[in-house]
Amino acid sequence: MKLSQPLSIFAILAASTVAVAVPQDDACAQCLTEGTFCEGFAGPVGTCCDGLVCENAPGVADDAHCIRKKKCLAKGETCVSIAGPVGTCCTGKCTFVAPDYSVCK
């Protein structure tokens, strides 16, 4: 019995030291990085880091990932190029200029 009492005290001391050494708040405060799964049918699993939003890919449901926030294109910026659509105009008006080239008006 004498050996088990010091062993129990040591176990309690070791457990309390580990509990104090591991900060719990930091684990909850970490944000999700680009490309990380963030929300599904069961709900959100975290918060995306600054500059990212949690969105599903077009045509996909219940499988959202953190992606960069989409910015609209200002007047005069190219909205369609030879490579295809570049983005959405802030005004909503993408005007044809030449084949495979349109700008925001």
UniProtKB/Swiss-Prot annotation:
It is found in: Secreted. Keywords: Secreted, Signal. Residues 1-21 form the signal peptide. Its main location: secreted. One of its GO terms (cellular component) is extracellular region. Interacts with Arabidopsis thaliana PGIP1. Effector protein required for full virulence. Directly interacts with and functionally inactivates PG-inhibiting proteins (PGIPs). PGIPs are a defense mechanism of infected plants, that inhibit the plant pathogens secreted polygalacturonases (PGs) used to degrade the plant cell wall. Excerts its function by interacting with host PGIPs to negate their polygalacturonase-inhibiting function via enhanced dissociation of PGIPs from PGs. This is Secreted effector protein PINE1. The gene is PINE1.
